[in-house]
Amino acid sequence: MKKKILEVTNLHAAVNEIKIVKGLNLVVNAGEIHAIMGKNGSGKSTFAKIIAGHPDYTITNGDITYQHTSILELTPEDRAKRGIFLSFQYPIEIPGVTNADFLRLACNARRIYQGLPEMEPLEFFEYINSKLPLVDLKPSFLTRDVNEGFSGGEKKRNEILQMSILDTKLAVLDETDSGLDIDALRTVANGIKSLANDGNAIILITHYQRLLDYIKPDFVHVMQEGKIIKTGSASLALDLEKYGYDWLKNELK
């Protein structure tokens, strides 16, 4: 029997009293990769932020359970400590905080929650250096301030590096392929694939088939008007690439 990581039941959510998510249902099991696709404004990024606990969004109905426990009352920090990871579409810069310090603090916060001892700076330095080849980054990268002056590819690779050290159980990757050239896309995709295992689950939010050329999802979901209107195999993404979204209009009826 598959281990359930995430279950979203009849989820409704709003921001400033504007309804964004309107009856969304989704089950994600351990070992699965799910892709969520849809037009701009369909609610994909909002859904990602809601899973992570973004305070701007109000849940008006439904529930989100993670590892069989409702997380609606948990803060974003508590969700992260439990193993939920969100990669941002537009990662922010944090001047004055080096990557090494940021990553060590995040890693130790997760370890404390797991009942593990904190890593000392030298121990963590060895650990993080062993992870850098995963996303083709050099050790000098760790001395730079978080995302400051980074290229788009470096920002996205930095997020996959974060995912790798946090023992992530549910990764929600919001348009990780956005703004990446072919080489950077391949590096990021290979990093994501290497982190997928039978004990975690990944949700990819994307507009394009090109990311799915590198990472084959077990399920593809189409969002429209705040809910999932169709679910299929990886071939559904190919149909969307070929025909667009208009042929799915009848699914809303």
Curated annotation (Swiss-Prot):
InterPro entries: AAA+_ATPase, ABC_transporter-like_ATP-bd, ABC_transporter-like_CS, FeS-cluster_ATPase_SufC, P-loop_NTPase. GO terms for cellular component: chloroplast. Residues 6-250 form the ABC transporter domain. One of its GO terms (molecular function) is ATP binding. The keyword Glycoprotein does not apply. It comes from the Eukaryota. It is found in: Plastid, Chloroplast. ATP binds at G38, K39, N40, G41, S42, G43, K44, S45. CDD domains: ABC_FeS_Assembly. Keywords: ATP-binding, Chloroplast, Nucleotide-binding, Plastid, Transport. NCBIfam families: sufC. Belongs to the ABC transporter superfamily. Ycf16 family. This is Probable ATP-dependent transporter ycf16. The gene is ycf16.
